[in-house]
């Protein structure tokens, strides 16, 4: 992602600019060299805030402090983003009842934590000839967790395994 470049002091190309003071007061439209002299007299920088406006808007401020605040804002935004993790639970078509309940409990925990869950059913040997056992097992898992989850991807075959992806229900 390219960082937006901000024109500062001599890098500003417009002849006339609208100037905003250090304390957010409007100083009006003035020639660039006059605005640069004003900023220099206050020992601050002239920063182009809105280059697309007519005339461009520039603000008298401490550019180093401005960059620091921008980086802090970016870090805060990154902190607030939620990262979705897909957890996986593997089953077999002949998985015993107690073991299946145990795996379903794992899927429930993943969903309650806010993560997605991938339920994979692995066929071995000749088990693949009886796919209905696998479909039944995945449907059982889906029916057990339908109160807290929604099926994002229906059961689908991929090689010797069948999988489905479930996600937490969106709270209204």
Swiss-Prot record:
Question: Where is the protein localized?
Answer: Cytoplasm
Report the GO terms under cellular component: cytosol; membrane
What is the top-level taxon of the source organism?
Bacteria
Name a biological process GO annotation.
Answer: ribosome disassembly
Where do transmembrane segments lie in this chain?
Answer: none
Q: Name one GO molecular function term.
A: ribosome binding
Task: Give the keywords, sorted.
Answer: Cytoplasm, Initiation factor, Protein biosynthesis
Task: Decide whether keyword Calcium is in the record.
Answer: no
Pfam families attached here?
IF3_C (PF00707), IF3_N (PF05198)
**Complexes and interactors:** Monomer.
The similarity annotation says: Belongs to the IF-3 family.
Task: Please give the function described in this protein's UniProt entry.
Answer: IF-3 binds to the 30S ribosomal subunit and shifts the equilibrium between 70S ribosomes and their 50S and 30S subunits in favor of the free subunits, thus enhancing the availability of 30S subunits on which protein synthesis initiation begins.
Please report the name of this protein according to its UniProt entry. Translation initiation factor IF-3
Annotated source species: Geobacter metallireducens (strain ATCC 53774 / DSM 7210 / GS-15)
**Per UniProt, what is the name of the gene that codes for the protein in this document?**
infC
